[in-house]
Curated annotation (Swiss-Prot):
It comes from Bacillus subtilis (strain 168). GO terms for biological process: regulation of DNA-templated transcription. Keywords: DNA-binding, Transcription, Transcription regulation. Residues 1-92 form the HTH arsR-type domain. One of its GO terms (molecular function) is DNA binding. CDD domains: HTH_ARSR (cd00090). This is Uncharacterized HTH-type transcriptional regulator YuzN. The keyword DNA-binding applies. InterPro entries: ArsR-like_HTH (IPR011991), HTH_ArsR_DNA-bd_dom (IPR001845), HTH_MetalResp_TranReg (IPR051081), WH-like_DNA-bd_sf (IPR036388), WH_DNA-bd_sf (IPR036390). Residues 37-61 bind DNA. The keyword DNA-binding applies. The gene is yuzN. SMART domains: HTH_ARSR. It comes from the Bacteria.
């Protein structure tokens, strides 16, 4: 679990990744294109889809983002279970 904790804290340690999680938690399912457009327009970020894909890789390694195929698109989904499990020991 320590490795997973480290991965979660690493993922949360970057402000862009936190914005990605904010958007995914707000909208539930987004494609990479939709996520990119939201980040650029809502937060005035200067970021490419490739850079977001790298951030998503870190979030996926931590278990905070999953994806599934919907037709020809890959949809991104926020998974808050790792955060709940991490905090459970401290809060209870």
């Amino acid at each position: 679990m320590n490795g997973n904790k480290d991965a979660i804290f690493k993922a949360l340690g970057d402000s862009t990744r936190r914005l990605i999680l904010d958007e995914l938690s707000e909208r539930n399912e987004l494609t990479l294109y939709e996520l990119t457009i939201r980040l650029i327009t809502k937060y005035d970020l200067s970021i490419t889809r490739q850079a977001i894909a790298k951030h998503l890789s870190v979030l996926e390694d931590a278990g905070l983002v999953t994806s599934k195929r919907k037709g020809k698109y890959r949809v991104l989904i926020f998974n808050n279970e790792p955060l709940k499990n991490l905090l459970k020991g401290w809060i209870e």
